[in-house]
Amino acid sequence: MKSTLRISLKAGERIFINGAVLRVDRKVALEFLNDVTFLLENHVLQPEGATTPLRQLYFIAQMILINPEGKDHSTALFRKSITMLLSCFRNEEILAELKRIDALVSTGRAFDALKAIRGLYAIEDNILNNHEMPPTMVEQIRREIAPWR
């Protein structure tokens, strides 16, 4: 990290830092003085929210960050998932971004991968709403890459 990073949290808000969950009881500002892996509570996807292929991929990438003990398992599941998604999507923008997301995770930049995945949600919603990906394929993906269900 080249400079410090300052984050403000409201009372009752949680933040996930290097696998630990912290909740603040009042408005606070945190200043990170070195490299840290963190997720703000509003960026944490719960399992029941992982309802589409890209949201499932997000959930898996998120687990790489917030569950360091299970990082190897989550990374293996991410590899399986990204391979499946690359063969299922036809949209060139999504395919190019999935390749970039794979490279981000491969180089230890899962946090950046999460941001990139969130950026694809609108395109994915369009694809699913227009049935450009058959519902049977969506269901197959859901079954294959959702072991937490």
UniProtKB/Swiss-Prot annotation:
GO terms for biological process: bacterial-type flagellum organization; mRNA catabolic process; negative regulation of bacterial-type flagellum assembly. The keyword RNA-binding applies. One of its GO terms (molecular function) is mRNA 5'-UTR binding. Keywords: Bacterial flagellum biogenesis, Repressor, RNA-binding. The keyword DNA-binding does not apply. InterPro entries: Flagellum_FlbT. Has a post-transcriptional repressor function in flagellum biogenesis. Associates with the 5'-UTR of fljK mRNA and promotes its degradation. Belongs to the FlbT family. This is Probable flagellum biosynthesis repressor protein FlbT. It comes from Rhizobium johnstonii (strain DSM 114642 / LMG 32736 / 3841) (Rhizobium leguminosarum bv. viciae).
